[in-house]
Amino acid sequence: MKLLFFFLVLAVSAAVAENAGVQKAFMDIEIDGESAGRIVLELRGDVVPKTVKNFIGLFDKYKGSTFHRVIADFMIQGGDFENHNGTGGHSIYGPRFEDENFTLKHDRGVISMANAGPNTNGSQFFITTVKTEWLDGRHVVFGKITNDSWPTVQAIEALGSSGGRPSKIAKITDIGLL
């Protein structure tokens, strides 16, 4: 009986350790003032804890910010809570912080840090709508969306243009941990 209990504790501990650092977050979205749904994210703090800490630490600033760059069949980009055009934002660590690692890859539906080159992560992020392997090793992936989030992501993607300027305003109205 004691041996069975030991193995049960060991199995539960292993399962908890495997999920340690993975957190779920949400973004409620509106398009031109009308609710467009919710994006649920699985944040991989087990792989990139500093990057996830930065993202979570900016929740209050992300509230009310927009997806300022939207390109169909590529990605939707947000996180510029200062200028709402891709020129602003900063990290919780200062203006910029270094690339943590490139372990996670740019599959369809991942959330990744936007940057201006190596070690220039701030607050801006993007969600891919297709596989974008050419970004591997250049941008830090820190999570992915859940399958039920696709309708909301696709509603934002539908606003896109080849130049990236969205046809309507897609805004984060609320954001937090689940």
From Swiss-Prot:
Claim: Isomerase is one of the keywords in the record: yes
Q: Which UniProt keywords apply?
A: Isomerase, Rotamase, Signal
Report the protein's function. PPIases accelerate the folding of proteins. It catalyzes the cis-trans isomerization of proline imidic peptide bonds in oligopeptides. Up-regulates interferon gamma production by bovine T-cells. Stimulates high levels of IFN-gamma production by peripheral blood mononuclear cells and T-cells. The IFN-gamma-inducing effect is blocked by cyclosporin A (CsA).
- Ranges for domain PPIase cyclophilin-type: 26-177
One GO biological process this protein is involved in is:
protein folding
The family annotation for this protein states: Belongs to the cyclophilin-type PPIase family. PPIase A subfamily.
A GO term from the CC aspect: cytoplasm
Against InterPro entries, the record matches this protein to: Cyclophilin-like_dom_sf (IPR029000), Cyclophilin-type_PPIase (IPR024936), Cyclophilin-type_PPIase_CS (IPR020892), Cyclophilin-type_PPIase_dom (IPR002130)
Protein name according to UniProt: Peptidyl-prolyl cis-trans isomerase
List the GO molecular function terms. Answer: cyclosporin A binding; peptidyl-prolyl cis-trans isomerase activity
Catalytic function, reaction form: [protein]-peptidylproline (omega=180) = [protein]-peptidylproline (omega=0)
User: Which organism's genome codes for this protein?
Assistant: Neospora caninum (Coccidian parasite)
Top-level enzyme category: isomerase
> Signal peptide: which range, if any?
1-17
Question: Which Pfam families does this chain map to?
Answer: Pro_isomerase
| EC number per UniProt | 5.2.1.8
